[in-house]
Amino acid sequence: MLLMNLFTIINNDVPTPYNMYFQDSTTPHQEGILELHDNIMFYMLTVLGLVSWMMIIIIKDYKNNPITYKYIKHGQMIEIIWTILPAIILLMIAFPSFILLYLCDEVISPAMTIKVIGLQWYWKYEYSDFINDNGETIEYESYMIPEELLEEGQLRMLDTDTSIVIPVDTHVRFIVTATDVIHDFAVPSLGIKIDTTPGRLSQVSTLIQREGIFYGQCSELCGAQHSAMPIKIETVKLPTFLTWLNEQ
């Protein structure tokens, strides 16, 4: 048992103090975002290293002999290099980013739809595909739990009294809007960040590939209690989701 515990994977699905990297991904979208970030960082560090090396060489040579390049006015070859090379690097960055941008905006045959409504300062969720025993759409509101009411293990400024419950490995579409001001529905582990605009319906899809609890927050300054709009998503197995659905 101890050996099994040593090899247990503990995913980072919540913000942690002094964390310098992303939360662990749980969707293909976030995997693509992480890969694009790492690729761009590679190009940035390569350019930084190359330019720094050139600057050091130039400063060193000039220090040894200030008049070495006194009469050099231009260099055609170096001008060609510093024009073409950055263009190639930008193209290598642009093409993957355009592809990822297109894929993140594409909504592919969702199995279920959840409507998200942002209000000052809480969220409202509607499961438009399901109705309860009274023939009404399943909907509820989600408020942040005040710090003085938090139980052991709950997270300050992140835990809510209700959460979005989603079956794992299911294509889910979020349709988002707002009733008052612009909010932003953002969950880092899912790679989701989309504005909720009054009078406008926007959509984003996701496929969560593992069970867990994922947190997000409103990421658009929306008023005095902007920080009191956390998002909590629970991903469960399909039988557990159906049981939860029957209880609503």
From Swiss-Prot:
Mg(2+) binds at E220. Its cofactor is Cu cation. Pfam families: COX2 (PF00116), COX2_TM (PF02790). Component of the cytochrome c oxidase, the last enzyme in the mitochondrial electron transport chain which drives oxidative phosphorylation. The respiratory chain contains 3 multisubunit complexes succinate dehydrogenase (complex II, CII), ubiquinol-cytochrome c oxidoreductase (cytochrome b-c1 complex, complex III, CIII) and cytochrome c oxidase (complex IV, CIV), that cooperate to transfer electrons derived from NADH and succinate to molecular oxygen, creating an electrochemical gradient over the inner membrane that drives transmembrane transport and the ATP synthase. Belongs to the cytochrome c oxidase subunit 2 family. Component of the cytochrome c oxidase (complex IV, CIV), a multisubunit enzyme composed of a catalytic core of 3 subunits and several supernumerary subunits. The complex exists as a monomer or a dimer and forms supercomplexes (SCs) in the inner mitochondrial membrane with ubiquinol-cytochrome c oxidoreductase (cytochrome b-c1 complex, complex III, CIII). Cu cation A1 binds at H183, C218, C222, M229. It is a multi-pass membrane protein. The keyword rRNA-binding does not apply. GO terms for cellular component: mitochondrial inner membrane; respiratory chain complex IV. InterPro entries: CcO_II, CcO_II-like_C, CcO_II_C, Copper_CuA, Cupredoxin, Cyt_c_oxidase_su2, Cyt_c_oxidase_su2_TM_dom, Cyt_c_oxidase_su2_TM_sf. Keywords: Copper, Electron transport, Magnesium, Membrane, Metal-binding, Mitochondrion, Mitochondrion inner membrane, Respiratory chain, Signal, Translocase, Transmembrane, Transmembrane helix, Transport. This is Cytochrome c oxidase subunit 2. The signal sequence of COX2 is processed by IMP1. It is found in: Mitochondrion inner membrane. Cu cation A2 binds at C218, E220, C222, H226. Residues 62-79 are mitochondrial matrix. Residues 1-12 form the signal peptide. The keyword Signal applies.
